[in-house]
UniProtKB/Swiss-Prot annotation:
Pfam families: Phe_tRNA-synt_N, tRNA-synt_2d. HAMAP family: Phe_tRNA_synth_alpha1. Its EC number is 6.1.1.20. This is Phenylalanine--tRNA ligase alpha subunit. It catalyses: tRNA(Phe) + L-phenylalanine + ATP = L-phenylalanyl-tRNA(Phe) + AMP + diphosphate + H(+). NCBIfam families: pheS. The gene is pheS.
Amino acid sequence: MENLDQIVSEAQVAFAAISDPDALEQVKARFLGKSGQITELLKGLGKLPPEEKKTAGAAINVAKTAVETALNERREAIRKAALDARLAEEALDVTLPGRAEARGGLHPVTRTLERIESLFASIGFEVADGPEIEEDFYNFTAMNTPEDHPARSMHDTFYLQNSDGTLADKVLLRTHTSPIQARYMQAHVKRYGQLGKMPEIRIIAPGRVYRVDSDATHSPMFHQVEGLWVGEGVSFADLKGVIANFLKSFFETDDLTVRFRPSFFPFTEPSAEIDVAFMSGALKGRWLEIAGCGMVHPNVLRIAGIDPEKYTGFAFGFGQDRLTMLRYGINDLRLFFEGDLRFLRQFN
């Protein structure tokens, strides 16, 4: 029988010289394969006398265990060396701060709307909503705008087309949020008209509106917030008080002057343009047109089913985008809608 200690020693030396896992398996076959040295010794046990077989078998198994131990240790050493090499190649500085999860933020126009809604809610106004694709009746007729009014022309209003390219029957993209007021007044009359006395209507109507216009201060799609207060004894003095208090709260300053200039709108009478002048800052001393307003025209109330002899009201309309530009000192309206994150992140 071959010297078992020599076989174990040869195996240990052979395994230690290998650094490749495939080569290690090939060397393993020399000792533990089907024709390996240890395997051949085990096969030869049958030729030994019974009195020697037991002793020889035990010695061979001890040698086999020693070879397997050396093999497994070398396998683990090769695996660890490969892992260490990979970690060194892909080394990370674990002391570096991790990447923070990106967080979104509200668009500045949305922030402005939330502020407007909050300020008007504090004095009892509700927020009303309505469709952006509107009927000609609610957009124009209900607002006392006659058939021959220039605002009805395709130069100012987006009319919708049917699938065959023909013009849809009096369906358009709303040019203001006044249709929300008309629909709300009709629903209010339907709900309370039989009671003899209706509760006051106090709403703001924010939303997207559409007009054929596009330059640095105008967009074919923009945001508008209109307001309506209808009740008994509502006056122009109430309108002036609401507007002045809102503007001072919105801009967070008493250092501004509000001016009402006579104007014309078909849905209000009398009508006025609202200007503001700041007494300090970059806009100091400049009058800036900021909104339109007026007492609700009696015809608008009649069309909604409200008696203009008993009830009066006022309405106003702010450009939400215009307020946002003034609030943040932005000169070009288009910047808000170009989707440039470098610009928008400044407001978060």
